[in-house]
Swiss-Prot record:
Its EC number is 1.1.1.86. Residues 182-327 form the KARI C-terminal knotted domain. The keyword Transcription does not apply. GO terms for cellular component: cytosol. Mg(2+) 1 binds at residues 190, 194. Residues 1-181 form the KARI N-terminal Rossmann domain. This is Ketol-acid reductoisomerase (NADP(+)). It comes from Chlorobium chlorochromatii (strain CaD3). Pathway: Amino-acid biosynthesis; L-isoleucine biosynthesis; L-isoleucine from 2-oxobutanoate: step 2/4; Amino-acid biosynthesis; L-valine biosynthesis; L-valine from pyruvate: step 2/4. It holds the Pfam family KARI_C.
Length: 330
């Protein structure tokens, strides 16, 4: 894969351009402020009733409606929730785009699954920092940055890749490294990781471990500590140095037990189910299911949220976290 750094990106491809960032959430605030402080001409596009309008203005940014920001801009970055992007695009973005404009995204979902199909006269790019927005912002203010992905979907002007690299540089990303990919690979790996490992797999593993201990007669408090609370300690070791760092850092007892018992849990049958989940991402079945869920008023998701919130691990966890001074907001 191609990896780019400071010397490979030139802010000149954005200087003199009018840039609209649509959304001011986790990523939106980081993109807006980092580009603004990199000397670029940035406006934020929001719904007039959005509570984020005041926050953006307090940060020194100019705020207008989504339609006005798009009409004004040469480059439009869409950082709205996936499920909202299609409707906003059709109503407020598409009518205000002109040939030669650039449409940018932080995630490939709507382009890859053809929920949004821009005119062929418009550049379509992606700049995706591989961290939460607060870390994108913090590392920038410290003079550093986080690794980013870039991709080009359409390039009628011949400058799409250079614009994506310049954007990543303005975020601070070229100080860490910018990896070139495509919308398909970014979208499919992102969704699979969320479903099979990060959000789906890990949550179910935690609940199953907690339930196993409680059903065997152990106190809920101990089950919580062993199956939920201490997970952060292990994940931090993975994050800092991979599997080897974790195995080096834990006791020999933990290392041996994990290496000999772990494969009994994550069996070939589990991996086969992972492949099925990946296939549903690849062929669009998950995307269709999620879009239908959103259009239907989140009925299934609402039930799942309620079930999760009522799980015993949530109740004992809330009680135990009150004992942890570092978690109590002052």
């Amino acid at each position: 894969m191609n990896v780019y750094y400071e010397k490979d990106a030139d802010l000149a491809y954005l200087q003199g351009k009018k840039i609209a960032v649509l959304g001011y959430g986790s990523q939106g605030h980081a993109h807006s402020l980092n580009l603004h402080e990199s000397g670029l001409n940035v406006r934020v596009g929001l719904r007039p009733e959005s509570a984020s309008c005041a926050k953006a203005r307090e940060a020194g940014l100019e705020v207008t409606s989504v339609a006005e920001a798009t009409k004004w801009a040469d480059i439009v970055m869409v950082l709205l929730p996936d499920q909202n992007q299609k409707a906003v695009y059709e109503a407020e973005i598409a009518p205000n785009l002109e040939p030669g404009n650039t449409l940018a995204f932080g995630h490939g979902f709507n382009i890859h699954y053809k929920q949004i199909v821009p005119a062929s006269s418009v550049n379509v790019i992606m700049i995706a920092p591989k961290s939460p927005g607060h870390l994108v912002r913090r590392t920038y203010t410290e003079g550093n940055g986080v690794p980013c992905l870039i991709a080009v979907h359409q390039d009628p002007t011949g400058e799409a890749k250079q614009q994506a690299l310049a954007w990543a540089k303005a975020l601070g990303g070229t100080k860490a490294g910018v990896i070139e990919t495509n919308f398909k690979n970014e979208t499919e790996t992102d969704l699979f990781g969320e479903q099979a490992v990060l959000c789906g797999g890990s949550a179910e593993l935690i609940k199953a471990g907690f339930e196993t201990l409680v059903e065997a007669g152990y106190p809920e408090e101990l089950a919580y500590f062993e199956c939920m609370h201490e997970l952060k300690l292990i994940v931090d070791l993975y994050y800092e140095g991979g599997l080897s760092r974790m195995n080096y850092s834990v006791s020999d007892t933990a290392e041996y037990g994990g290496m000999t018992r772990g494969p009994r849990l994550i069996t070939p049958a589990v991996k086969a189910e992972m492949k099925k989940i990946l296939e549903e991402v690849q062929d669009g079945r998950f995307a269709k299911e999620f879009i239908d869920e959103c259009n239907g008023g989140y009925q299934n998701l609402s039930k799942l949220r309620e079930s999760n919130s009522n799980h015993a691990i949530e109740k004992v966890g809330a009680k135990l976290r009150n004992m942890m001074s570092w978690l109590i907001k002052k």
